[in-house]
């Protein structure tokens, strides 16, 4: 065994001072001293349990001892009589075995392959033991779940990722998917439950047993987000539901995840074989599938952007040449050829890599370099995590942990270790780039005129600028020169290293050449230099623009077209990554795919890291907003589609925010107990105004109200029990907090909840019954007008149906025409006096006479006036489709409805484009005269003369 290095010998003295009397220094072996010096986790564990150290010294860890885990665990659980006891014993067993694994790993008593096997087998044994204990307990409580033939139904657990591949790292969360075979009901219990209820409750208890922190810690952090539909999907699915999902909706990334899926525990049963056979066609295609390369390239691009966004340059998993790239290389061959080559269907990386070499898909040399690099990186990763039992892949910056890793990896010092590490990662990167690297080859230095370089380097005399800037006016020439000079002065105030200077000197001549070719060069350059000032100290973003000429061209054209986009990019430079792929930049996410895209995006963020979750939500929104704006500018999205995309995006964000708030509240208080007998959450979010009407703009806030259906006597079922209605109030407050918290990426949305019953003076969240009562007995006419544009944007089916029924009932009430006309007209006049244009010779597109609000009031008046006779008028909440309904139901002439629709979309289109130019929503008085005259005539007809 290698002696401790000098820094570690010094640190040993600090360790000695912590040791209790039973662990006196003189009684410890050299091995014990080495491990205690290396790992604070082992040190803390044996201080709490000195008998573990005695056991380690007398019975050192063996390579094959994973075969005994099941028997050891069975003995540990033999006297467990309740769930609390189960949780305690599982946590202690996991910690005891992890100490043994850390000991073996630190001293290199066993191979790295053996360490990965032991870590994975330990997790599997703990998961299966917890499942089996809880299954018996739940059967005693509720009966045994059976199918229609009376056959008992088990809970099958798919271990995903490294757990499934038998390659779990030292401090890892576990990705699981729960499934049961067939529908049916429980038999033999005090009361009957259907199988879905049984397995959902059992699954919730299993997650709690494994995941909930106690004074003994936790067993594993459990991540269920890989299941169908993610967090918004059922916790447990039947085989039939799983099959339907993967056949009809399974995404490429879910296919990649399923490559490593492995059934935990006894995997030779009938149901296990059925599940495996069902999933295999989804994962391994019968034909050779080259579409995989582009899909994996896209995924790698997402990860590269994540590395840049979170500054993960020293990350041995996600960084260039890291563990993830080796996994991608192997998966390419599995997914392209695995359907035809059974040897490629292994879940584990190293056997698959051997099969790839045997099939001559990679050269023997490349395969061997990848194998050696993988084992080196995995050992380094596991050692790094075993220092503090901490889930990290980022190399340390402190001297102590660097000394620890250098010693444990058998190097003299840190530079020697990083030298070998760099060589391994370079080998991986080379193979990765040859196989699934970027489409574009490395960009060559373009032959730029020396004058552009001199212009940037400030060597041109004033007269010498004429050739390169000759097409610009004299004022623009002067402004361009001044902008370059000001930018260079700004650079002198900032700390930019040699690398940053070098990248800038390469980038700026290209940028100036492209910008100055434009007629609007001065305006465009002013917007781009403002952006560059914000990123000059972040060399990775400069490199992105320097190395990808296409990204630079997109940046220039977008900044020229829209100051809003320019300022967004300046505030949030991580959005620059979106410029890399024009296929996605000018092609927004499909309207029905925002939820799934967001779900995939959030999977990369730890579920329990609230700060990162908040950042990720905001960054996703900004990236999607950029795509929508880019498509709008390019003319590929008409105004109606712009609002559709902005609305679908907002709904996806609402869905994710409610999910996060719900998880946080349930973790703190448990669920309201009235939900035990029903599906759903008993909660709904209703969108009013532009959100309700599918008419969001780029900077629209969200008008929301919150409803629940919680009975007065309901309580939550957690350890910190609170009143059920108090739970929903806190849930709504949490949702508001998640929307409005300002992070480095800004806020998510401004949320206005004042349209709730009694406005700002009312409760933030209202019961469904109280909402209905208020609308029937207390609401003003303007509140009924608002209801015309309201719809549920998040909610379980029961509450959604209840709201829709109340809305329909209120809108179809008989109303006296003259009274309604007067009330609507007076409300509009009040608004115009309060909000109308204060600028002479200007037309406020939204608030002035003949503008958007007049059209909205006309449609709302006509729905409230005639829905009693024509209930179909209540179907839609957006103005365009309401105008269609008015024509279809013979309330309004078709010609008038179409003319109002054209006026409405024209005015809204102008508002969108003014927002892109960061201009207020008013225009010259002589604009849109025909549209305004048409709206005035319609207003006169319906709200004055009728």
UniProtKB/Swiss-Prot annotation:
Top-rank lineage group of the source organism: Bacteria
GO CC annotations on file: cytosol
Requisite cofactors: Mg(2+)
Keyword terms: ATP-binding, Magnesium, Multifunctional enzyme, Nucleotide-binding, Nucleotidyltransferase, Transferase
Pfam families: GlnD_UR_UTase (PF08335), GlnE (PF03710)
GO molecular function: [glutamate-ammonia-ligase] adenylyltransferase activity; [glutamine synthetase]-adenylyl-L-tyrosine phosphorylase activity; ATP binding; magnesium ion binding
Region (Adenylyl removase): 1-440
The reaction(s) this protein catalyses: [glutamine synthetase]-O(4)-(5'-adenylyl)-L-tyrosine + phosphate = [glutamine synthetase]-L-tyrosine + ADP; [glutamine synthetase]-L-tyrosine + ATP = [glutamine synthetase]-O(4)-(5'-adenylyl)-L-tyrosine + diphosphate
EC number, as in UniProt: 2.7.7.89, 2.7.7.42
GO biological process: regulation of glutamine family amino acid metabolic process
Region (Adenylyl transferase): 449-946
HAMAP family: GlnE
Similarity comment: Belongs to the GlnE family.
Function: Involved in the regulation of glutamine synthetase GlnA, a key enzyme in the process to assimilate ammonia. When cellular nitrogen levels are high, the C-terminal adenylyl transferase (AT) inactivates GlnA by covalent transfer of an adenylyl group from ATP to specific tyrosine residue of GlnA, thus reducing its activity. Conversely, when nitrogen levels are low, the N-terminal adenylyl removase (AR) activates GlnA by removing the adenylyl group by phosphorolysis, increasing its activity.
PANTHER family membership: BIFUNCTIONAL GLUTAMINE SYNTHETASE ADENYLYLTRANSFERASE_ADENYLYL-REMOVING ENZYME, GLUTAMINE SYNTHETASE ADENYLYLTRANSFERASE
Protein name: Bifunctional glutamine synthetase adenylyltransferase/adenylyl-removing enzyme
The organism of origin for this protein: Escherichia coli O81 (strain ED1a)
């Amino acid at each position: 065994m290698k002696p401790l290095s000098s820094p570690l010998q010094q640190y040993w003295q600090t360790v000695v001072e912590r040791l209790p009397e039973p662990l006196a220094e003189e009684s410890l072996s050299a091995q014990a001293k080495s491990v205690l010096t290396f790992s604070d986790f082992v040190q803390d564990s044996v201080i709490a349990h000195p008998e573990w150290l005695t056991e380690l010294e007398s019975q050192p860890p063996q390579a094959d001892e994973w075969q005994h885990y099941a028997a050891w665990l069975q003995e540990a659980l033999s006297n467990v009589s309740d769930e609390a006891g189960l949780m305690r014993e599982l946590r202690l067993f996991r910690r005891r075995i992890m100490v043994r694994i850390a000991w073996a790993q630190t001293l290199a008593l066993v191979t790295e392959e053996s360490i990965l096997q032991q870590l994975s087998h330990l997790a599997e044994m703990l998961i299966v033991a917890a499942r089996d204990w809880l299954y018996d307990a739940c059967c005693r409580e509720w009966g045994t779940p059976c199918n229609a033939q009376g056959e008992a139904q088990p809970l099958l657990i798919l271990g995903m990722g490294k757990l499934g591949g038998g390659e779990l790292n030292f401090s890892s969360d576990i990705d699981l998917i729960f499934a049961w075979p067939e529908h049916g009901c429980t038999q033999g219990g005090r009361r009957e439950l259907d199988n879905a209820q049984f397995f959902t409750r059992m699954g919730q208890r299993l997650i709690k047993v494994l995941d909930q922190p106690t004074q003994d810690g936790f067993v594993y952090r459990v991540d269920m987000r890989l299941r169908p539909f993610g967090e918004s999907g059922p916790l447990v699915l039947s085989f039939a539901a799983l099959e339907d999902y993967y056949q009809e909706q399974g995404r490429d990334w879910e296919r990649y995840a399923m490559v490593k899926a492995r059934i935990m525990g006894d995997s030779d049963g009938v149901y296990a074989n059925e599940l495996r056979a069902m999933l295999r066609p989804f994962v391994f295609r019968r034909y050779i599938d080259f579409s995989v390369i582009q899909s994996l390239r896209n995924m790698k691009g997402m990860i590269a952007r994540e590395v840049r966004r979170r500054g993960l340059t020293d990350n041995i998993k996600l960084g260039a040449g890291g563990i993830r790239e080796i996994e991608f290389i192997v998966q390419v061959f599995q997914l392209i050829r695995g359907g035809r080559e059974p040897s490629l269907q292994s879940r584990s990386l190293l056997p698959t890599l051997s099969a790839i070499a045997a099939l001559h898909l990679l050269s023997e040399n490349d395969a061997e370099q990848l194998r050696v690099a993988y084992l080196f990186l995995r050992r380094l990763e596991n050692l790094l995590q075993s220092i503090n039992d901490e889930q990290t892949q980022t190399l340390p910056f402190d001297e102590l942990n660097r000394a620890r890793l250098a010693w444990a990896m058998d190097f003299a010092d840190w530079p020697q270790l990083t030298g070998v590490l760099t060589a391994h990662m370079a080998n991986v990167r080379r193979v990765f780039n040859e196989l699934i690297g970027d489409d574009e080859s490395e960009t060559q230095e373009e032959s730029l005129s020396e004058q552009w370089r001199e212009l940037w380097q400030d060597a041109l005399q004033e007269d010498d600028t004429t050739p390169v800037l000759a097409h610009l006016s004299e004022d623009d020439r002067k402004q361009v020169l001044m902008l370059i000079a000001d930018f260079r002065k700004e650079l002198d105030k900032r700390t930019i290293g040699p690398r940053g200077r070098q990248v800038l000197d390469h980038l700026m001549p290209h940028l100036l050449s492209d910008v100055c070719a434009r007629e609007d060069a001065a305006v465009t350059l002013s917007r781009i230099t403002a952006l560059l000032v914000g990123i000059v100290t972040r060399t990775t973003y400069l490199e992105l623009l320097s190395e990808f000429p296409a990204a630079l061209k997109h940046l220039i054209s977008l900044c020229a077209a829209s100051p809003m986009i320019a300022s967004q990019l300046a505030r949030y430079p991580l959005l620059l990554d979106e410029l890399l792929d024009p296929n996605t930049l000018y092609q927004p996410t499909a309207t029905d795919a925002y939820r799934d895209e967001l779900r995939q995006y959030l999977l990369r963020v730890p579920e329990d890291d609230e700060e990162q979750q908040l950042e990720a939500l905001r960054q996703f929104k900004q990236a999607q907003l950029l795509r929508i704006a880019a498509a709008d500018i390019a003319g590929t999205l008409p105004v109606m589609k712009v609002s559709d995309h902005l609305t679908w995006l907002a709904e996806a964000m609402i869905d994710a925010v409610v999910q996060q708030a719900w998880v946080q509240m349930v973790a703190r208080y448990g669920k309201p107990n009235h939900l035990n007998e029903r599906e759903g959450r008993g909660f709904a979010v209703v969108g009013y105004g532009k959100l309700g009407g599918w008419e969001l703009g780029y900077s629209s806030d969200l008008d929301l109200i919150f409803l629940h259906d919680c009975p007065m006597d309901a309580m939550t079922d957690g350890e910190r029990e609170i009143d059920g209605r108090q739970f929903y109030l806190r849930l709504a407050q949490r949702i508001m907090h998640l929307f409005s918290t300002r992070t480095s990426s800004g806020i998510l949305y401004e949320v206005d909840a004042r349209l709730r019953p009694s406005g700002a003076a009312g409760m933030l969240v209202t019961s469904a019954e109280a909402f209905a009562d208020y609308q029937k007995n207390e609401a003003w006419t303007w509140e009924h007008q608002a209801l015309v544009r309201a719809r549920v944007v998040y909610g379980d089916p029961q509450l959604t149906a209840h709201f829709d029924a109340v809305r329909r009932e209120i809108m179809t009430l008989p109303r006296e025409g003259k009274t309604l006309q007067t009330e609507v007209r007076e409300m509009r006049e009040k608004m115009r006096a309060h909000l109308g244009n204060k600028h002479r010779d200007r037309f406020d597109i939204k608030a002035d006479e003949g503008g958007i609000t007049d059209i909205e009031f006309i449609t709302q008046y006509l729905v409230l006036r005639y829905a009693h006779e024509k209930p179909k008028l209540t179907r839609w909440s957006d103005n365009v489709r309401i105008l269609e309904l008015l024509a279809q139901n013979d309330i309004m002439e078709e010609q008038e409805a179409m003319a109002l629709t054209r006026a409405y979309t024209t005015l809204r289109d102008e508002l969108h484009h003014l927002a892109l130019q960061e201009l207020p929503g008013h225009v010259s008085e002589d604009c849109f005269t025909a549209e305004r005259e048409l709206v005035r005539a319609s207003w006169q007809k319906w709200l004055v003369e009728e």
